[in-house]
């Protein structure tokens, strides 16, 4: 899955290794894997409960479907900060629909990051064969 770029953001694909580090609460490992600084409050239990609808074993059994389109939002400036994530709730179904969601850390809200990340993610999804509708 490619990295997506916007004017201010780099959207880095979520991998099983990132999921495992988040679930373990291993901030240093997450930072190393995504090559960016995480907020002090990240990862935390609330993030884990919001972000992962499936358990790690389900993700490992079908990572392509479970992590389809999921990316971490990282600022492209010199600070390289994780400001949130944009995720799809799985790969497209037979009906051609996918559902997108996002989360932005509190200190980075109201700066347009979610709009920017969601736009490029929706464009990416709609460019895939079999995707006809993106719901939010």
Description of each model-found segment:
Residues 110-115:
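Glycine-rich acyl-CoA binding loop
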Residues 1-99, 104-107, 120-124, 128, ...:
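GNAT-family acyltransferases
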